[in-house]
Amino acid sequence: MSEFQLVSPYQPTGDQPKAIAGLVKSISEGHRFQTLLGATGTGKTFTIAHTIQQVGRPTLVMAHNKTLAAQLCNELRELFPHNAVEYFISYYDYYQPEAYVPSTDTYIAKSSSINDEIDMLRHSATRSLFERRDVIVVASVSCIYGLGMPEEYLKASIPFKVGQEINQRDVLRDLASIQYERNDLELVRGRFRLKGDVLEIVPAYEDRVIRIEFFGDEIEAIRLIDPVTGEILNSLSALRVYPARHFVTPEAQLERAILNIEQELEEQLALFRKEGKLLEAQRLEQRTRYDLEMLREVGYCNGIENYSRHLTGRKAGEPPACLVDYFKADDWLLVVDESHVTVPQIRGMYNGDRARKQVLVDHGFRLPSALDNRPLKAEEFWAKVHQCIFVSATPGNWELEQSEAQFETRVEDGKTLKFYVQGSGRVIEQVIRPTGVVDPEVHVRPTAGQVDDLLGEIYLRLERSQLGPAERVIVTTLTKRMAEDLTEYLQERGIRVRYLHSEITSIERIEILQDFREGAFDVLVGVNLLREGLDLPEVSLVAILDADKEGFLRAERSLIQMIGRAARNVRGMVVMYADTMTSSMARAIAETQRRREIQLQYNRQHNITPKPIVKKNSNAILSFLAISRKLNDPDLEKAFQAAQEIPLSEIPELIGQLELKMKEAAKNLEFEEAAQLRDRIKKLRQRLLGHPQGI
């Protein structure tokens, strides 16, 4: 029986029961790849949640960016409140990789800032994978980067049990060996302190305190303590403390690694000198000798990850261990969300990393073994995957091929193209929306007078908004300049309009989308920012300017994704402005019409009247400062209430800002406000972890 407990007031409807049954059947039959081809707004996440619940295996859900990963994690935590739904993304707030530009002889040192909260979540994810089966890890593509060997990580963990006899000095030495730091004054994550017979540890994977009480050398009690109030939260009979860092190197392995690094250094120096590269040889020797001295003395050096091949005992070219290796062999499931974007990302990670590091090696900044500190190659990643579900409204041909779909070839515009044959292979379609809302009508109109025609459509929706539910408009252009010019033109005619393009920061982007949903303006103009993951049920019109300009932004998949932005509204409509009908346009329109006819027929058969989507507005402002500015109210309580709904990916940033405010308040002797902020930081950390964890 599955350990996953799905909690929802809703039952699967429309195509969902058929899709769930199809996916579960395909997986239970042992098929490696299957695809959920689900139209926008059909509840693909709900279908995947039911599939996970019925399959009952630990699951990795991959998304193509951290914002989408946070959205998925929030949704899955609501559906699985009693299970471990973890969040695993890159822990860098800022990252400037090491690089060298030969043309200008410019060396750029690595510069980074690690987010402590996200690091805690990463440790929480790996701990859950060791200790339970009912685990869903939602991750970005960065999870294919090296993470340290799971065997060494588990082997280095320290078990504690009530009644166990253990020398206190040995415990302190063991904690130090797995990167915990002793500090008897300030107890924070990754530190421990000993006072008399009481040892207190804050593990790497959460902020609760583990208190171990000794009677002589015998463990008398193990308790979980609230770090703020000191309240006893739980008493345990046993627990295991995992290392403070994922990269764990035993002392014997470190000594072997140092010898291997020295040997590689001598070989590379001989090669450089033979080729007359004396500057490169001098540079490499100086840098590497310093690193070796640091490794001997303190077991660590800056850029230690560049020696990871030696430290983990891998051979040249062997893939590094990553998050996938923390899952148990073949007993797990992979779900790739928005696979048409995520799969190419997996494919491209290795090449970009390799090109940068090769320059460093060629010019004596790094040993050749640094090339093995890398993300997995695509083929290495897929070799580790036992069973997988691709999820997309527009899956790529590669995903469809892996799902054994059939294709037909046609010549269009002088090119031979492959097209998926509907209903073939292990491709499960999900077309019917639970709300009964059908795909929008698509109209093609000439480009002559397109702006005036668009203006008329906008005015029509503004008039309807006065009498009924609010309607919004999305307009997509081909260039940033066009977006800005169109925005200015519409503003001059009294339209409340904003634009989005690549130069707008992620925080500003979410603020603009939030204002759009709340009705602060009615028209949003953008370039390539209005496709996957933009969930706005208020949008009743999507206008696509220059739809006949073939290219990535007007390819079939891009057009279907843009059409999908109007597919959540009962009055959804799409207008493509074009003078010719391109093959991409024709295919996108034909697919939309095919889905629309299926949906209309289903509604007629089941006497369903489409209902507008009522969606909780959860994309709140991303930072405390933005919340305060938006409310125009210094009242901390109101600002914090607004902060309760922020996306999961932004909580670490908010915690950092609240901590700065807390320290500033304490410095100004405003202890009451500092205490309020401390309590709120604690609540946000609890939300970040997502569920009360037993250790």
UniProtKB/Swiss-Prot annotation:
Classification of source organism: Bacteria, Bacillati, Cyanobacteriota, Cyanophyceae, Synechococcales
Quaternary structure, from the entry: Forms a heterotetramer with UvrA during the search for lesions. Interacts with UvrC in an incision complex.
Binding residues for ATP: G38, A39, T40, G41, T42, G43, K44, T45
GO molecular function, one term: ATP binding
Domain (Helicase C-terminal): residue spans on this chain: 454-617
The organism of origin for this protein: Synechococcus sp. (strain JA-2-3B'a(2-13))
Comment block on domains: The beta-hairpin motif is involved in DNA binding.
Gene Ontology biological-process entries: nucleotide-excision repair; SOS response
Protein's UniProt name: UvrABC system protein B
Motif Beta-hairpin per UniProt: ranges: 91-114
